Amino acid sequence: MMPLLHLAGTLIMALFLSCLRPGSLNPCIEVLPNITYQCMDQNLSKIPHDIPYSTKNLDLSFNPLKILRSYSFTNFSQLQWLDLSRCEIETIEDKAWHGLNQLSTLVLTGNPIKSFSPGSFSGLTNLENLVAVETKMTSLEGFHIGQLISLKKLNVAHNLIHSFKLPEYFSNLTNLEHVDLSYNYIQTISVKDLQFLRENPQVNLSLDLSLNPIDSIQAQAFQGIRLHELTLRSNFNSSNVLKMCLQNMTGLHVHRLILGEFKNERNLESFDRSVMEGLCNVSIDEFRLTYINHFSDDIYNLNCLANISAMSFTGVHIKHIADVPRHFKWQSLSIIRCHLKPFPKLSLPFLKSWTLTTNREDISFGQLALPSLRYLDLSRNAMSFRGCCSYSDFGTNNLKYLDLSFNGVILMSANFMGLEELEYLDFQHSTLKKVTEFSVFLSLEKLLYLDISYTNTKIDFDGIFLGLISLNTLKMAGNSFKDNTLSNVFTNTTNLTFLDLSKCQLEQISRGVFDTLYRLQLLNMSHNNLLFLDPSHYKQLYSLRTLDCSFNRIETSKGILQHFPKSLAVFNLTNNSVACICEYQNFLQWVKDQKMFLVNVEQMKCASPIDMKASLVLDFTNSTCYIYKTIISVSVVSVLVVATVAFLIYHFYFHLILIAGCKKYSRGESIYDAFVIYSSQNEDWVRNELVKNLEEGVPRFQLCLHYRDFIPGVAIAANIIQEGFHKSRKVIVVVSRHFIQSRWCIFEYEIAQTWQFLSSRSGIIFIVLEKVEKSLLRQQVELYRLLSRNTYLEWEDNALGRHIFWRRLKKALLDGKALNPDETSEEEQEATTLT
């Protein structure tokens, strides 16, 4: 029974394994599909065979491979880079690298290889870089790499090598350029050690012997030897040993000699002129001195250094270098991380390049006299410039490169007169003063590169970049503009291809700012405060490839999104305040449609509304908007209908009452001859003049007056309509300044108009009590129009004027009045009297 159970278990396991896809058990990480794989520290005991044959880069470091057997890499014919660091490899069998014809870099660091057979490196026909650091190698003689005819760089640092002898097989390595033997145990250098170089003068080799405890160099050891570079750093335990060894390097021809110590490896107690005298018998083109503490200031007066082309001091405790003789033919001088004080006022007629950076002491710029200078780097010195920049500052007309970045305050007092050849100018992280007070760069028509980033500049002068007609790179991040608005400062810079406006606190962009930048390829607008994305600003940028608007406050777009240049390939809109609402539906849909060239579009998140905050922009759906639109449309229409009906009812309420009243009283007789509409300010005139002459005169008229005839306890509006209009034949409107300014009077007048329209008769009599300014009268358009087109009565406070006024008013009131016989005789008598 048990064998059957074992058989069943085996079959189930086999079935399970057969269902796994090929390569699913591969522990390696696919960095680039089919190109780069990382198998570091996966406890592999052999080379995995399920990695694609097309792999070019393979990291197998920190795996216990122990032995590299023959044909281990047959499946990797395309491999170019192989890292086998610390794989505990002790043995490399012949033909272990078979098939690696394309391999160019091999790293064997940290493997305790016991021995190398003559065929250990066979098959590596194109290997250019071999790293065998910390392999416990004791000699180059047993390191059989003579077959590596393409080898250019050999690194055997941190080993146990005691002899500097370069074996005979080096004669096969005709392409060898650099050998790193640093941190070994080489103590002596003899004549025979360099026989290979003496017999092969065509080899242009660089040797690094740093950190070897050299205590002697045999006389004539370097006689007739040519090297491209020789590095001797932290090799000598005293100045005397160094002095003796330098004297025995007589006859050496070296392009670049690097001498000194490391920052954390200091052995020499002093370094003076006598130590350097040994170099007088060495032919040197470039000399570099590094990390020397006790340095004699007169060392640069050594005449044997007069003819070198390049001098470099790095980390040297040098205090001043002002007395370099004028006849020195130095063409390049570098002073990096030194302790100069004060600023060196050099006068070297042959100097073309000068670098003074990261000085450890505070210094202020002083004028120079360097007529051949083309390259000047004074960055990272916290220097102050009391005036910049013109020919008088540097004493040259040939300057092409000027770096004044990471300094203190730079006062711009000139516009680079005499420096018209400048092509590169860097002020970043220095504080520029007066840079916007005039066209500072007007003379720099050949300038190609300008960096004024983080210079505390507020740009309020549109002519700041006048003259820069050749400029192709402009960096101005970290500054600000007037009113936080990008103004038209680029009109003259038509050749720009790179423009950085990040972190400029921009909120708006003026129209046409970029319209002349037809060649611009990269525009960085990130880390500003832009609220909208307006494609019209970028419409004329026909060559634009990259646009970065990330880290702004953009909610949506303005204008037509299709106006972006067709050349645009990379667009970054991440980290903005995108509003995922239906109002911006077109913009959100455009974001979805442009996924191909929007950077990290899948990470773009909504900032509002609250219920959508932190959700992905791509998750916003248009269908939601259609539902919302339907609900909102129905709701809005319903509200509008109800509001309109309510408004009409409210607005025409009294008119409706008037209509109803007209129907009710249409067949009844009028009680009053006229209903008087007037302002309370004119009540005295109504009582003393109008009532007295009409109700007590002949014929007599009955007037409806609100203070006398309105029924108490009834709403005023109801009294006006029912007692005033419905029971009166006519309406007298007393027009005055107070009348026009009274909203209640105007309301009564509007009801009177409706009454006149419904009664189909001319029943309104206008009395203009006083002169009213036309400007005031025009405020009531309808009243002004009626007074302009109809006859009205004007009150004149004189005998003749009164006589005519009352005669005309009574005549108007008699129109349509039914008179009894008594009233008729009285009327005739009154008429006779008036005649």
UniProtKB/Swiss-Prot annotation:
It comes from Rattus norvegicus (Rat). Disulfide bonds join C28-C39, C280-C304, C388-C389, C580-C606, C582-C625. Residues 26-638 are extracellular. The TIR domain mediates interaction with NOX4. Residues 576-627 form the LRRCT domain. Residues 660-835 are cytoplasmic. Residues 1-25 form the signal peptide. Pfam families: LRR_8, TIR. Glycans are attached at residues 34, 43, 75, 172, 204, 237, 248, 281, 307, 492, 495, 524, 572, 575, 622. It is found in: Cell membrane; Early endosome; Cell projection, Ruffle. It comes from the Eukaryota. PROSITE patterns: LRR (PS51450), TIR (PS50104). Gene3D superfamilies: Ribonuclease Inhibitor, Toll/interleukin-1 receptor homology (TIR) domain. Keywords: Cell membrane, Cell projection, Disulfide bond, Endosome, Glycoprotein, Immunity, Inflammatory response, Innate immunity, Leucine-rich repeat, Membrane, NAD, Receptor, Repeat, Signal, Transmembrane, Transmembrane helix, Ubl conjugation. InterPro entries: Leu-rich_rpt (IPR001611), Leu-rich_rpt_typical-subtyp (IPR003591), LRR_dom_sf (IPR032675), TIR_dom (IPR000157), Toll-like_receptor (IPR017241), Toll_tir_struct_dom_sf (IPR035897). Belongs to the lipopolysaccharide (LPS) receptor, a multi-protein complex containing at least CD14, LY96 and TLR4. Binding to bacterial LPS leads to homodimerization. Interacts with LY96 via the extracellular domain. Interacts with MYD88 and TIRAP via their respective TIR domains. Interacts with TICAM2. Interacts with NOX4. Interacts with CNPY3 and HSP90B1; this interaction is required for proper folding in the endoplasmic reticulum. Interacts with MAP3K21; this interaction leads to negative regulation of TLR4 signaling. The keyword Cell membrane applies. Belongs to the Toll-like receptor family. Transmembrane receptor that functions as a pattern recognition receptor recognizing pathogen- and damage-associated molecular patterns (PAMPs and DAMPs) to induce innate immune responses via downstream signaling pathways. At the plasma membrane, cooperates with LY96 to mediate the innate immune response to bacterial lipopolysaccharide (LPS). Also involved in LPS-independent inflammatory responses triggered by free fatty acids, such as palmitate, and Ni(2+). Mechanistically, acts via MYD88, TIRAP and TRAF6, leading to NF-kappa-B activation, cytokine secretion and the inflammatory response. GO terms for molecular function: identical protein binding; lipopolysaccharide binding; lipopolysaccharide immune receptor activity; NAD+ nucleosidase activity, cyclic ADP-ribose generating; phosphatidylinositol 3-kinase binding; protein heterodimerization activity; signaling receptor activity; signaling receptor binding. GO terms for biological process: activation of innate immune response; astrocyte development; B cell proliferation; B cell proliferation involved in immune response; cellular response to amyloid-beta; cellular response to lipopolysaccharide; cellular response to lipoteichoic acid; cellular response to mechanical stimulus. This is Toll-like receptor 4. Induction: Induced by lipopolysaccharides.
